[in-house]
């Protein structure tokens, strides 16, 4: 009896799906964080988890097995030198999938997939911006707008007398 395998087809043929997942895995290893659709991120997570587990063995055989999936020497070098060194004691769970808002063009569910030990804290910068906005005093927009209008007027005012002096100086020496 036919049984269904629990995997996403991603709307591709088997060869195209394998190539897509290979490419996404390579980019994840090189960049440590990529943004893609949610389905591709979840499938990439499966592939990358297995690759990193093989890489932790550190043998030549493991390198050759991984090269079947990745096919990029720079990515394999990064995997064995940087990533395995950081995740050496971790037993699985090397990646994280974070869901994002839908893509603007086609409303596809988007996600970020990243290596856990290489995650940076991008949330620190937006919090600082929010604090600056919340400290704004009522009516300060009007004062900022009037100050912005006054500043260009103040800068433009000194230029006008300088230009008016030059034509007068040129007009005076003409005698016939």
Swiss-Prot record:
Domain of life of the organism encoding this protein: Bacteria
GO terms assigned for molecular function: structural constituent of ribosome
Transmembrane segments: none
Region (Disordered): 124-176
Keywords for this protein: Ribonucleoprotein, Ribosomal protein
Pfam family, one: Ribosomal_L17
Regions of compositional bias (Low complexity) in chain numbering: 145-176
A GO cellular component entry from the record: cytosolic large ribosomal subunit
Family annotation (InterPro entries): Ribosomal_bL17 (IPR000456), Ribosomal_bL17_CS (IPR047859), Ribosomal_bL17_sf (IPR036373)
One of the GO BP terms on file: translation
Keyword Membrane: no
Family membership: Belongs to the bacterial ribosomal protein bL17 family.
HAMAP family with a match to the protein in the record: Ribosomal_bL17 (MF_01368)
Self-association and partners: Part of the 50S ribosomal subunit. Contacts protein L32.
NCBIfam families in UniProt: L17
Name assigned to this protein: Large ribosomal subunit protein bL17
UniProt source species: Chlorobium phaeovibrioides (strain DSM 265 / 1930) (Prosthecochloris vibrioformis (strain DSM 265))
